[in-house]
Regions:
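Transmembrane beta-strand segments of Gram-negative outer membrane beta-barrel proteins
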Residues: 24-32, 68-78
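N-terminal ordered "arm"
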Residues: 25-62
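Histidine/cysteine-enriched polar flanking segments
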Residues: 34-36, 40-47, 69, 77, ...
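Outer-membrane pore/translocation modules
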Residues: 73-217
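Short regulatory "switch" loops immediately downstream of catalytic or recognition motifs
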Residues: 1, 54-59, 204-207
Length: 217
């Protein structure tokens, strides 16, 4: 891990992720997922994400109370491959090749440090060529891994997609310095439909939730 600290900026390079604070309440990130970290290359094979966001306190017009708002932008690419990715025979593939290039905006509003909700919208394009997935993956395989090109003989077709997302986050104090926290997501649209939730215990006296954007304050 490499840390470079100055008075107003910091930069962290760690396992393919690059993050830097642009101001007290904002972040810029470059994040890479790759299943070769785990010695395999199938299904969700690669993800590359350029991220920017910020959060700030704002006053409500009616009550003059402060609440938190965070906004996030992500430019990303995801690649999926079958487990037998060297075959060119469709009947031997358990999963199609898939490329997904997208731009996402999301906004979260926290009425207090332990209760928040959000929404988001994603625009993108699928397809081996349009998403640049085939070119990106084969270039990486040839130049970095010294492997043969993958066939991409059967892939999800090229199309423009729109997806929407909602989220809900909360925290409940169990006892001093122990809090039960959860965050739930729902996504629906023309490219992906799904739901997920995560929960756990937050230890310590730090206010807020671990899901509150990238905590750089």
């Amino acid at each position: 891990m490499i840390n470079v600290l100055t008075k107003k900026h910091f930069l962290i390079l760690f396992f393919g992720s690059l993050y830097g604070s642009l101001a007290a309440q904002s972040y810029l990130g470059f994040n890479v997922d790759n299943d070769l970290y785990f010695g395999s290359d199938r299904y969700y094979s690669s993800g590359i994400f350029l991220e920017y966001g910020f959060h700030r306190k704002v006053k409500s017009d009616s009550t003059n109370k402060k609440h938190f708002i965070s906004k996030h932008w992500t430019l990303g690419q995801e690649i999926n491959t079958p487990s037998l990715h060297k075959t060119i025979d469709k009947k031997d593939m358990d999963f199609p090749y898939s490329g997904w290039l997208f731009l996402r905006f999301s906004k979260e509003r926290y009425k207090n440090s332990d209760f928040g909700f959000g929404w988001g919208v994603t625009f993108g394009v699928s397809g081996a060529e349009a998403s640049l997935a085939k070119k990106m993956q084969n270039t990486y395989h040839i130049l970095v891994l010294n492997l043969e090109e993958l066939s991409w003989s059967f892939s999800i077709p090229q199309a423009f997609h729109i997806n929407a997302q909602t989220s809900f986050s909360s925290g409940i104090i169990i006892r001093q310095n122990i809090k039960f926290v959860q965050q739930s997501h729902l996504e629906f649209g023309t490219f992906r439909i799904g739901a997920k939730t995560k929960f756990g215990l937050q230890l310590g006296n730090l206010q807020g939730l671990p899901f509150f954007g990238y905590r750089l304050e």
